[in-house]
Amino acid sequence: MKHNGRLKVKFDFSFFAVVAFMIFIDTSGAAVLSLIACILHEGGHLLAMAVCGVNPERITFYGGGIALSKSGMESLTDAKRLVILSAGCSVNLLVAAACFAMQGNDTAAVFGAVNLIICIFNALPIGYFDGAEVLELLLTGFVSLRTAEKVKKIIGTALALIIMAGVIVYCVMCGESVSLSLFFVVLFLIQAQLVS
């Protein structure tokens, strides 16, 4: 099916459910800042796609975040694909740096931390995150696509297990209970790796 160049925006019910839940339990305002940081992240991808001449088909807001279709990238050079895949994390990193430069502004510090966390999280080579796509792209320069996909899956699974084990060890060693947000992060890592 030929793409007509118009961006379709889809809102899944799960997006509204998660946003409502997060706003209900969040008294700090970090949930709203996280949503803004996610929009900035996807905006980075959209800007890079426009610069590289790619028209995205669809952006979907769902319970796990925001997903942007990156179809049409197959015909691009590896360098352009790398720019597009890295653009979201780059925007979050730049916003974090700008926020941390604003000394004495607590909201800016929280927004900077949220952007840094989203940058790091998306850079992980796990599942369908940007880091996994970058890893696969880099690996295909040395091995076949099939081998690159297998290596990506192994690295993603190992890293997800290490992160989950680290959370468990931290909680046991420090006598801490797992917070609801940490539980959802671990659950999201598992889901991302299983879906990919």
Q: Where are the regions a protein language model picked out?
A:
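Hydrophobic transmembrane alpha-helices and their immediate loop junctions
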Residues: 1-196
